[in-house]
């Protein structure tokens, strides 16, 4: 007698269920895909006991004939394809034909279905994959699938389910994802007889507000671009919406929910320094591509896909997101304002154009046209890394006669400066424009924040992180140029390092020289500081050096930053003016000038906000003015 035997169908189905059905959310996913593929425009999801007791999906799709209904519960029976080549033109979510067979083998399974022209509905019941009843019943057109007592006959699987809160959380996240991917479908979710949502319209922003709170959609940026290979559309969030986890990042390929490491990494890199460490931006992005150029049959749960040319996808995806991020004003509002990306009303949300000299009076305090940055420039920065040569130029530091040297106005921006200077006093009476000849109002609050009157209300700037942003970009530019900008000390300063400090010093000493530090070895684990960058405060040279090394080591341990990026961040953090330091009016004005000459004036290198704005409309609302 042979030792190898063919497994009975019910045993094979139970084994297959181990891959297809991992938890109640897996059941929901497979049944929702079938409901969507049936052409339904109304789907209800009913859950009890986090899916352990009941999962029921009701749709108003095409329904099935008796023959199709019986075949649907057989393994490898599907209406989605006939040949392996059909995978190249697949337009459905499901295609393997094993979901219902696997689900019915580990549950008490009931299928009700009626085609539009059928007089009655058909009802089929299965227990552990074995048919136990077939009957005719009254019912509406469409299909209803009920899955009770999941894993009742596989106690080991049932035992390893998580808490109700965890299992229900997976179900809710799944239904939310599908409801965002298919706004044309009316979605209803009931959990333990409580209705959680019932969407009757196709308004995507209304759904986002329902899921994330009123006003959430106001903090989104719309994205849309396409070429012959790929289309990208959807929404990304302001940095204020950043999350601890990546659960609120939705990627859809031809409206199929997927997970893709390349897309996640490119999204994170596009935001770069706008994010606080370990935070992730919100994203709801739909990618459209020829089905023949993407393989969806690479994961048991169909969550992963493989592109035939991943490089081309990445090369288009990153610049589109980077452009949307770069052209937008990410300064947070103190209260919820208007929608941030509306056609015809985005001048107030596009951000400040780089300024210099006296430019803050005409640029920082006015609403300006968006920055013109090409896709080529954006892709160049992605391709070449954080210190590539294609980055937009950052103004070179000037002399050290003031605390914050004023950068020169780039020639390409002089026209914008002139335009805004000429229009500065043309606003209507009461519009918040300064009278001709008056300087914009600036106040220092508790020697920590700068409060500025702007055309639309007021702006609050954190002086420490603002200076940190200025110093960071200046340090990056100096190290890229490899032309040290050093000021020699009249009296060199000696620094003695501890062993670990000296190890770090040896690692970064070449980049310290590029940054502007002129250093000479002086005995064992000691150096003489003979020159420093022009931004280093007199008398703080030795302290700054040791603080930088400590900061560098901490960043290397926690964040694993690229060496020069780490050094630039350590230098700017330790050398920036501190909260509590009083500034003169000239220093405040110069700091603002320098801030708005940077590429990213809205966040410090570590992702903290630099600017918060409050509009007159918000103030009027708080004081009860109509």
Curated annotation (Swiss-Prot):
The keyword Disulfide bond does not apply. It comes from the Bacteria. The keyword Transferase does not apply. GO terms for cellular component: mismatch repair complex. Pfam families: DNA_mis_repair, HATPase_c_3, MutL_C. GO terms for biological process: mismatch repair. GO terms for molecular function: ATP binding; ATP hydrolysis activity; ATP-dependent DNA damage sensor activity; mismatched DNA binding. Keywords: DNA damage, DNA repair. Belongs to the DNA mismatch repair MutL/HexB family. This protein is involved in the repair of mismatches in DNA. It is required for dam-dependent methyl-directed DNA mismatch repair. May act as a 'molecular matchmaker', a protein that promotes the formation of a stable complex between two or more DNA-binding proteins in an ATP-dependent manner without itself being part of a final effector complex. This is DNA mismatch repair protein MutL. The lineage of its organism: Bacteria, Pseudomonadati, Chlorobiota, Chlorobiia, Chlorobiales. The gene is mutL.
């Amino acid at each position: 007698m042979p030792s190898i035997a063919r497994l009975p169908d019910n045993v094979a189905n139970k084994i297959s269920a181990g891959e297809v059905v991992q938890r109640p959310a897996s059941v929901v996913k497979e049944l929702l895909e079938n409901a969507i593929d049936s052409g339904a425009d109304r789907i209800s999801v009913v859950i009890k006991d986090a899916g352990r007791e009941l999962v029921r999906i009701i749709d108003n799709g095409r329904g099935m004939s008796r023959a199709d209904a019986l075949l649907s519960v057989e393994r490898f029976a599907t209406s989605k394809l006939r040949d392996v080549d059909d995978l190249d033109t697949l337009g459905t979510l499901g295609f393997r034909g094993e979901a219902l067979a696997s689900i019915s083998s580990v549950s008490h399974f009931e299928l009700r279905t009626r085609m539009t022209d059928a007089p009655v509905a058909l009802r089929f019941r299965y227990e552990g994959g074995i048919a136990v009843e077939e009957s005719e019943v009254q019912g509406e057109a469409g299909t209803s699938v009920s899955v009770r007592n999941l894993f009742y006959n596989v106690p080991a699987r049932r035992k390893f389910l998580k808490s109700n809160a965890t299992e229900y959380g997976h179900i809710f996240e799944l239904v939310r994802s599908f409801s965002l991917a298919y706004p044309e479908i009316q979605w209803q979710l009931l959990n333990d007889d409580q209705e959680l949502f019932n969407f009757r319209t196709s308004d995507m922003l209304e759904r986002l507000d329902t899921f994330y709170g009123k006003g959430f959609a106001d903090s989104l940026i719309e994205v849309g671009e396409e070429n012959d290979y790929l289309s990208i559309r959807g929404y990304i969030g302001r940095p204020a919406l950043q999350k601890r986890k990546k659960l609120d990042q939705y990627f859809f390929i031809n409206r199929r929910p997927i997970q893709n490491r390349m897309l996640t990494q490119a999204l994170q890199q596009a935001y770069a320094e706008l994010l606080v460490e370990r935070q992730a931006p919100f994203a709801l992005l739909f990618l459209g591509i020829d089905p023949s150029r993407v393989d969806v049959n690479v994961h048991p749960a169909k969550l992963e896909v493989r592109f035939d040319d991943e490089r081309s996808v990445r090369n288009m995806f990153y610049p589109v997101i980077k452009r949307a991020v770069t052209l937008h004003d990410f300064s947070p509002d103190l209260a919820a304002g208007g929608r941030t990306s509306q056609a015809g009303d985005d001048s107030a949300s596009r951000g400040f154009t780089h300024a210099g000299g006296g430019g803050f009076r005409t640029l920082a305090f006015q609403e300006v046209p968006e920055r013109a940055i090409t896709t080529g420039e954006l892709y160049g920065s992605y391709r070449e890394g954080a210190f590539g040569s294609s980055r937009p130029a950052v103004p070179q530091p000037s002399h050290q006669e003031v605390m914050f040297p004023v950068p020169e106005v780039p020639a390409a921006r002089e026209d914008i400066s002139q335009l805004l200077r000429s229009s500065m006093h043309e606003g209507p009476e009461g519009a918040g424009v300064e009278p001709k000849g008056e300087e914009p109002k600036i106040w220092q609050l508790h020697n920590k924040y700068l409060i500025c009157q702007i055309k639309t209300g007021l702006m609050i700037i954190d002086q420490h992180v603002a200076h940190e942003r200025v110093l960071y970009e200046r340090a990056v530019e100096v190290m890229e140029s490899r032309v040290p900008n050093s000021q020699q000390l009249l009296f060199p300063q000696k620094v003695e390092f501890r062993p670990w400090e000296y190890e770090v010093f040896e690692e970064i000493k070449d980049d310290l020289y590029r940054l502007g530090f002129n250093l000479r070895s002086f005995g064992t684990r000691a150096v003489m500081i003979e020159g420093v960058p022009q931004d280093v405060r007199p008398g703080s040279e030795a302290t700054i050096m040791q603080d930088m090394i400590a900061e560098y080591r901490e960043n290397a341990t926690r964040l694993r930053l690229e060496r020069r990026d780490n050094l630039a961040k350590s230098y700017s953090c330790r050398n920036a003016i501190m909260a509590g330091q009083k500034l003169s009016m000239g220093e405040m004005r110069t700091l603002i000038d320098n801030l708005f000459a940077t590429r990213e004036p809205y966040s410090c290198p570590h992702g903290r906000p630099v600017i918060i704005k409050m509009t007159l409309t918000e103030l009027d609302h708080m004081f009860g003015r109509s």
